Amino acid sequence: MKKTLIAATAISLSAMALTACGSDSDSSAGADGDSGNGSITMGFAQVGAESGWRSANTKSIEDSAKEAGIDLKFSDAQQKQENQIKAIRSYIQQKVDVIAFSPVVETGWDTVLQEAKRANIPVILTDRAVDSEDTSLYKTFLGSDFVEEGQKAGQWLVDNAADSDVDGDGDIDVVQLEGTTGAAPAIDRGEGFADAISADPKISVIASQTGDFTRDGGKQVMESFLQSEKGIDVVFAHNDDMGLGAIEAIKAAGLTPGKDIKIITVDAVKDGMTALAAGEINYIVECNPLLGPQLMDLAEKVVAGEDVPERVVTEETTFDQEQAAEALPTREY
């Protein structure tokens, strides 16, 4: 199937019980918790709680729903697609006004999204996109440009190639800690990074494996890389948590993270920024999890039948060590 993530120009802008393998909650935010009073009811199917980024994202959504007076029905899929599909079907049966979700993986959503469409329930993709030829199955996408995030990470390495050849052999050997297999950020960040580093033939990815966006996963994969690969110069982790796990593995091997092995990550959550300020991470590309206010605004508009952009991309920045130290005192997540 041809990948279609929405062709429109990006616009930047600053229940029924589930099975035992998932969980859900009703975080009613309306004046009396009754959607019959004219307030909007949103069903939100979250990926899980696999990282600091995801926890901040969930809090932003819950807090923003309360502030907007939106009745929020929330489910945690624990990183399993089947749990998200069950949650979405539950929301359809409950006749919520709008469904939002962050897809665990890109593919396999057409059937359940067609069910939502037949029920006249609009869908908002949040944080992650889906791979579908039928873009009528959702109203809009809200989140980051993951390809650009990967490109920013790779461009920093190209720009700092001279300092990144740690072993001095003339080649820059990179190991990559990938996110969840099949997930949009893992696919797109990897593609963006590969595109950027192709400008310098000295840079190559010598090993790449999923750490599933978790700290433990990053640590385990990095331990394996340190045993199987010689002369690692750089780690590119698809999120901060895997990078923090890699730091633990590097230290356990008697090496100094940020010096003996350079580390580039994506997210810019507090733990990652703290490691960056301490010099254990060398560069972080921001991925803003605070999508709640924009999500509630979009939900109100689509329920009212208003036109919304097909793609809403958040504005984000990058951080080096000095910038991280400056930003940390006021960091929200």
Q: What name fits each language-model region?
A:
Residues 11-12:
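Repetitive helical segments and hydrophobic/amphipathic motifs
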Residues 15-18:
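Bacterial Sec-type N-terminal signal peptides, specifically the leucine/valine-rich hydrophobic h-region
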Residues 2-8, 20-333:
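A residue-level marker of the well-folded mature domains of exported/periplasmic proteins
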